[in-house]
Structures are given as C-alpha cells and as structure tokens.
Amino acid sequence: MAKPELEFFDPIVVASMPWVPVPGYPEGIHEKILAIDPPTGPWRHKTRFLRFQPGVETKETFVHDYWEEVYLIEGILIDVGKNQTFKAGMYCCRPPGMKHGPYKIPFGAMAYEVHYYLK
C-alpha cells in the first residue's frame, strides 16, 4: 500500500488540522501529518509539518532506516552533535543510517518533512 492519492486542497483545511504531540519526542514538539502510509509504521512513508516550541531540546542522536528530507520553514535548529546551526530556508536529504542531533531549538522552529523507503 502507498500513501493516499490527494489532489491539491484548500490551505484553510491544512491550517485547521490539529497539531498533535509526536509520540516518543520531548514535550513541545508537534506534528501535522499531511499524508501517511499506515502499514509502514508511524515513522515511515510520511509527509508532515513538524513544529518545535521555543526552548525544546532533544537528548538523543537520531538514526533511522528510512530516507528523510527536511526543509526548515522558520526558526533555527542547533545540531549539538555536529556543532552546526541550521536556519530557515535550509534543506537536507538524509539517507538511512545518517546520524543527526541532538538538537536545541532556542526560539522555536517549523519544518516540512518527508520520510520514505527506497527499494
């Protein structure tokens, strides 16, 4: 199975979708899922907005078995492990196994993310 087929829809619909706490993440991190392929599990084949409240810090280094693309819409993410700061307008494409984080988000941030597997 794949993600559902979705034609363009009104941004008011997206704006009215709830921000939901991300299971397993620290408090202050919320997601708005646009599309998901449920059989692949909660972390895979997903398109979402991710919002970080000011002052959020993650504790772990992240490594996963799927591809992840991230476009930072607003704010700043500080990758403590790499000692790098990422700003709004920056983009990354992470292959499976790429380490990233932990993060500090001093002023809040929002990102657009796509998670997927390639065979």
Task: List the predicted regions and their residue ranges.
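Alpha/beta-hydrolase fold active-site loops
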Residues: 67
